[in-house]
Amino acid sequence: MVWTLDRPDRLNALPDLEDGEAFAAACDAVNADPSIRCVVMTGAGRAFSAGGDLKAMKDRRDLFEGSGAAIRERYRRVVHRIVRALYGLEVPLVSAVNGPAMGLGCDIAGLGDIRIASDRASFGVPFMKLGIIPGDGGSWLLPRNIGYNRAAELLFTARSIDAATAEQWGLVLSLIHISEPTRPLYI
């Protein structure tokens, strides 16, 4: 089964308020269907996922409107639900990273049991640059994927890495060199 993050006009930014429920329902459906043996997740357009919607954060709307307590509760109900749902998949998840995977996008990609990337991919956790904490589980997951020292460097400096570095560090298993932007990564 192939899942495509499909908001290319927003670089597949996440989440919209309904995304927690949508990811949970999709994962539940996969877990209930024994004919599905694997899920491949990729992004539409030129990005895997830009992560959080910075414009919504700045404008304090949608997930980010209201009091701190209201934002925290929505974050748990939406973002944490997405991460828990993906973590709870009972079939292998292949992250086919076709372009930038930043913040929440990097963390979701990191949940893949197998991670492959286009040579156009890049990875980063720019939370410090934005003055916010990484609250979606990535600070727990990233050290398990690339080791403590490298994870700390990325988390503390907000530096991004290219696909070749991600492969060297073990964040992705292999690179696929794309000659045509529409060629699927999972073939």
Regions found by a protein language model. Give the residues of each.
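Glycine- (often His-adjacent) and acidic-residue-rich active-site loop
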Residues: 10, 14-17, 43-82, 101
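Short, glycine/polar-rich helix-capping loops at beta-to-alpha or helix-loop-helix junctions
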Residues: 159-164
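Single conserved hydrophobic/aromatic residue that forms the stacking wall/gate
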Residues: 176-187
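Conserved CoA-thioester-binding segment of acyl-CoA-metabolizing enzymes
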Residues: 1-44
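CoA-thioester-processing core
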Residues: 82-88, 96, 102-156, 169
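Hydrophobic/aromatic residues within transmembrane alpha-helices
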Residues: 41, 53, 108-110, 166
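Short, flexible helix/strand-to-coil boundary loops that buttress conserved ligand/catalytic motifs
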Residues: 15, 52, 58-61, 127, ...
